[in-house]
Amino acid sequence: MRAGRATGPVHPSTPLIIMKLDDLYSELTLKTKSKLVLLVLDGLGDIAVGGADATTPLEAARTPNLDALAVTGAQGRLLPVAPGITPGSGPGHLGLFGYDPLEFQVGRGVIEALGLGLELKPGDVAARANFCTMDAKGVVTDRRAGRIDTSICEELCGLLRQKVTSVGDAEVLIQPGKGHRFVVVFRGQGLEGPLTDADPHREGLPIPRSEPVVAGSAKAAKAAGLVEAFYKAALPVLSGKLPANGFLMRGIAHQPDIPTFEVRYQLRAACVAVYPMYKGLAQLVGMSKLEGSQTLTEQFERYLDAHDAYDYFFIHYKNTDMYGEDGNFEAKKKAIEELDAALPVLLKKRPDVLAITGDHSTPCPMKGHSWHPQPVLLVSEFAGSDRFPRFTEATSNQGSLGIQEAKFLMRLMQANARMFDKFGA
């Protein structure tokens, strides 16, 4: 008989304890004086198409400051949700914050509403909206209404607020965002989400009717009826307001319960972002919002100003994603170079743990989010050095971090901050 581990019956009085992984991390967590920074270049990852000489914007960019960090850090790839799944920005960021995006699902409307400073109440249903252009038959011809200026968005939202104050028995709240974006909140009794998007997601199609995602929910059915009523009331108000004579709504949902960042990680956290959605994501998990910055340099200066007040900073940079969605290789490359040029400001107070990554990939050839794992660079005294001279998709493929689920990046940052006690004897 082959030798092996001795086995025997479990004594009836011996309880079998199965610990959830999050509970284990919580049990092992120690307080820290370290400073942790997550720098997100939205949609950073890309793909090289066209043979051996093909490259990506990150590979083509001149990035001396990122290169200097790469020499001292560890690289790898992050899988935002699961193989083959293309994430939205919400799941992508929640994963980076260490929240399983399959367990904690949040509608984009909720995120945008919080980011714009709206206080959501129990029973509120929020939708992210953007103005669009429609032809005479109601077919969407431009999903972003020519990227109208924020001032025009504010003017149109003001008009809608005057003309459509309620639908059914629900109050309607309308808040303008940046550019063509705005938020609609339905405030009433007996409402819930999620609902399907009133958005065809491409030009050449009419706006679809919003329906409950979960069949049989009376509260969601009522909310869907309010969305339909809002369209009937609001579209006539926009008639003739080209290029913004229509609007799309998506991420229609109510606010879920999510444990706060400080409770989960014992870290005081702050967010430095420009766009409302990312402020909303941060607020959703209890981060403070450091307002007042518009440029990268200003964002990094806000970090310097607040350095001593917080343990963890989430800093968000949008342009890489925006140009990826436009399919503009050169502009995305330039956006990466602009980030690199501003990095010395951040490094005036170099964090103990610095993670640089994206929330997902936005390849220029695809002009949209994709399922490709995004590159990640982790720099700390204890991360170890892969000794690569650059930070790119190609070097990330060879890095010591390998391919990790994005939800574990936060735990790796904690480990590098020496925040975990030893597990077991």
Where are these regions (language model features)?
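Feature captures the catalytic ectodomains and active-site-proximal regions of enzymes
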Residues: 8-11, 15-425
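Basic polycationic patches enriched in arginine
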Residues: 2-5
